[in-house]
UniProtKB/Swiss-Prot annotation:
Lineage: Bacteria, Pseudomonadati, Pseudomonadota, Alphaproteobacteria, Rickettsiales
One GO term (biological process): translation
Source taxon at top rank: Bacteria
Gene (UniProt): rpmH
Annotated GO CC locations: ribonucleoprotein complex; ribosome
Protein name per the record: Large ribosomal subunit protein bL34
PROSITE patterns associated with the record: RIBOSOMAL_L34
Entry's family note: Belongs to the bacterial ribosomal protein bL34 family.
Keyword terms of this UniProt record: Ribonucleoprotein, Ribosomal protein
InterPro entries reported in the protein's UniProt record: Ribosomal_bL34, Ribosomal_bL34_CS
Any single Pfam family the record assigns to this protein: Ribosomal_L34
Amino acid sequence: MKRTYQPSKLVRKRRHGFMERMSSVGGRRVLMRRRMKGRRVLSA
């Protein structure tokens, strides 16, 4: 059986990166919450 997590830097950036987060209202909310929490890294 193939494992579920097959890491790829490109797919990670495209799906969870900063530009992707900024492209939707929900994604911007994620960034806002992470800023409020004081996260050093906001997105992939």
